[in-house]
Amino acid sequence: MAALKGYGLCSMDSALQFPCPKLFNSYKRRSSKWVSPKAAVVPNFHLPMRSLEVKNRTNTDDIKALRVITAIKTPYLPDGRFDLEAYDDLVNIQIQNGAEGVIVGGTTGEGQLMSWDEHIMLIGHTVNCFGGSIKVIGNTGSNSTREAIHATEQGFAVGMHAALHINPYYGKTSIEGLIAHFQSVLHMGPTIIYNVPGRTGQDIPPRAIFKLSQNPNLAGVKECVGNKRVEEYTENGVVVWSGNDDECHDSRWDYGATGVISVTSNLVPGLMRKLMFEGRNSSLNSKLLPLMAWLFHEPNPIGINTALAQLGVSRPVFRLPYVPLPLSKRLEFVKLVKEIGREHFVGEKDVQALDDDDFILIGRY
């Protein structure tokens, strides 16, 4: 993601005056790790408030209580910019159908394809429009600790209720490094740690989570390893959300998960709420499993992007490298919608297969 521009804070002519750090004093060692005076972070003056201020204070227990959190999709205009009208409609539908939180700019929301300016803007927009009705959890994680610190400060500055943090990927670190990375951001506010080894290439082991759980700001873990891991956490008092839609029913009712952070709820939020709130429902779960399998036939968010376009909820615009599912899979989705019932899905238009030529692929935006 694009680096954020820094500014000299010690200029006498600056409109915002900050004290110059005493460099020699700040280098005193109280332990084996040196901590900079401001965590090497400076405010971005184009943001609505300084990144060191906090707009909302949310109790971590409020985050721990959430059962249905939607990893919200980010729709696009034909030129690749955010389609905020479609985005607002989608978030409104989530609220109306009982979703309690949204992950903004996560994997499903394609935060990995956003600049940090886009990312923080979308978090702030979501807070300003919907923050009184739904918990806004900003994905401000990064494989760079410096970027994670900076983005998380900005996310809390524009009002997000909690942060989602992934472990450093590609340039993997040691378990001790994982712990130090998360400790660098945990003090800022309520935090969900996201464990998805299939994407990061590294599992976050329970011993790391148990160490981090000593911090009261750890709301819990979005866990994608499986239900045995879910059970291990719940038996040890760690809140956990299933990160696998196809396992979330059993995670909730058999293994003690608090709920789910879901992709499928973009499409059927009311049914996902029913699955998490109304007790064991094997019949409904079985009904939804084929849809969940379809959504993850290719890596997320390819399936959800294709489905929302077919439902007419978002434009058929893809930021590369994502491309739509082929026609054969789109025809399968039409059949799935009819089997489950169009009334359970978001939007009001008839589901369509769409032609290949209907899709717009954007590489420069």
UniProtKB/Swiss-Prot annotation:
GO molecular function term, any single one: 4-hydroxy-tetrahydrodipicolinate synthase activity
Superkingdom of origin: Eukaryota
GO BP annotations, alphabetical order: diaminopimelate biosynthetic process; lysine biosynthetic process via diaminopimelate
Family matches, as InterPro entries: Aldolase_TIM, DapA, DapA-like, Schiff_base-form_aldolases_AS, Schiff_base-form_aldolases_CS
Residues that bind pyruvate: 108, 261
Pathway assignment: Amino-acid biosynthesis; L-lysine biosynthesis via DAP pathway; (S)-tetrahydrodipicolinate from L-aspartate: step 3/4
CDD domains named in the record: DHDPS (cd00950)
Keyword Thylakoid set for record: no
Site (Part of a proton relay during catalysis): 107, 170
Transit peptide location: 1-39
Active site positions: 194, 222
NCBIfam families assigned to the protein according to its UniProt record, in alphabetical order: dapA
Family stated for the protein in its record: Belongs to the DapA family.
Protein name: 4-hydroxy-tetrahydrodipicolinate synthase 2, chloroplastic
Organism listed in the record: Arabidopsis thaliana (Mouse-ear cress)
